[in-house]
Amino acid sequence: MEKSVLRKEMKLLRKSMDKNDRTAKDKKIFENLIKLDSFKSSSWFYVYVSYGTEADTKNLIEYLFELKKEREIHVAVPKVLGDEMEFFEINLFSELEKGCMGILEPSTGNKVKPENAFMVLPGLAFDEEHKRLGYGGGFYDKYLSKCGAERFMKVAVCYDFQMQKKGVIASDSNDIKVDMIVTDKAYY
């Protein structure tokens, strides 16, 4: 399937979700994510700030802020700078402001150097081979290529209907696969 067609289809499906259904699925994704051993053992978390109909990460970020009271962890979120993306450490939601395309980004803060980290990635579609179809800007692929994808436990979160059969998502040589996909129903 053509990437543009699949992107459009996934956006429409996410947009058509019932609010209560979305809330229940977001809760299940969160619960599934925090059960992971790799999550429990991490001290650095690179997390996208959900926007629009994306699987929610704001509750996850709030949870991480609470977790900071119990153990030393660091939370970093992305900021688009031109045609690239960098991650900045944050300690409070109030450190975010609307940035590129209206997405919440750090207003200030310390740009982080790539650490061995647990990274939560967004996307429109994924498959059983761990291919990821993003929004087309290549921000995550460029960042991971530049920093070394092996430094991160790359975990995508999505609704189960965003999972595709093997071979549906075309990939280019610069596309970086995720290590795991967590949905409201399963782990892939």
Identify the role of each PLM range.
Residues 1-112:
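N-terminal active-site beta-alpha-beta segment that forms phosphate/nucleotide-binding
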Residues 12, 110, 114-119, 128-131, ...:
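Surface-exposed, charge/polar-rich loops and edge strands
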Residues 45, 119-120:
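Receiver (REC) domain switch-region micro-motif
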Residues 52, 82, 125-126, 162:
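Short, solvent-exposed loop/turn segments at secondary-structure junctions
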Residues 61-62, 135-141:
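Charged helix-capping and loop-helix junction motifs
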Residues 84, 121-123, 136:
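A short beta-strand-loop-alpha-helix capping motif that often carries His-Thr
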Residues 100, 132-136:
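Short glycine/serine/threonine-biased micro-segments
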